[in-house]
């Protein structure tokens, strides 16, 4: 886990100086796990947990920890992605895959430039007003807000066999995103 090795390398000098800021670049899916992205979501949840626990642990040493949580960013990452080229229409997970595709399509409509992530990092490390979590982009902010409003059991229950209309209605209610328009 590269983040842990990096933190282990810099933390002793930050502690001795009684200052510093560790920046973890996580993801909006580190706040609310998305189906069909389990390994990615799990790795980002782990980094979220690391940041939260470490922030508590090193606060007394004057060291800040921030988790920067981008949503969809305007890059070419999906151009050659296997996920975009392989879509098994006979899969029993097809409804979930289709809906998750709509979530991403919605995110692409509101994607932000990579520079916005850099600006957020700069703000997070220079502001006097400390916050642990820094969502980047409207989709990330929506997931951040929803994570604090939706019970985990309600999110899980959205995996039930709902009609697209029911699912879209619930999704819009929780996240403010109308998937029927994607």
Regions found by a protein language model. Give the residues of each.
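Core catalytic loop region at the nicotinamide-binding pocket of NAD(P)H-dependent oxidoreductases
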Residues: 108-146
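Active-site-adjacent segment of SDR/Rossmann-fold oxidoreductases
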Residues: 32, 53-64
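Active-site helix of classical SDR
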Residues: 7, 43
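A short helix-coil junction within the Rossmann-fold of NAD(P)-dependent oxidoreductases
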Residues: 9-18
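Active-site loop immediately N-terminal to the catalytic Tyr-X3-Lys motif
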Residues: 32-38
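Conserved internal alpha-helix in NAD(P)-dependent oxidoreductase domains
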Residues: 1-2, 17-20, 45
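C-terminal beta-strand-loop-alpha-helix "lid" module of Rossmann-like NAD(P)-dependent dehydrogenases
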Residues: 59, 63-108
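Residue(s) in the substrate-gating loop at a strand-loop-helix junction
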Residues: 27
């Amino acid at each position: 886990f590269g983040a842990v090795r990096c933190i282990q390398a810099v933390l002793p000098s930050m502690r001795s100086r009684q200052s510093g800021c560790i920046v973890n670049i996580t993801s909006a899916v580190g706040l609310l796990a998305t189906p069909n992205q389990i390994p990615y979501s799990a790795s980002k949840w782990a980094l979220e947990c690391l940041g939260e626990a470490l922030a508590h642990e090193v606060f007394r040493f004057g060291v800040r920890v921030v988790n920067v949580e981008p949503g969809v960013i305007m890059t070419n990452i999906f151009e050659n992605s296997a996920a975009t080229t392989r879509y098994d229409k006979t899969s029993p997970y097809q409804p979930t895959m289709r809906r998750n595709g709509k979530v991403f399509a919605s995110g692409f409509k509101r994607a932000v430039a990579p520079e916005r992530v850099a600006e957020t990092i700069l703000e997070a490390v220079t502001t006097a007003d400390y916050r642990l979590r820094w969502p980047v982009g409207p989709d990330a902010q929506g997931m951040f807000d929803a994570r604090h409003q939706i019970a985990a059991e309600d999110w899980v229950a959205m995996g039930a066999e709902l009609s697209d209309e029911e699912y879209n209605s619930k999704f819009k209610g929780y996240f403010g995103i109308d998937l029927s328009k994607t």
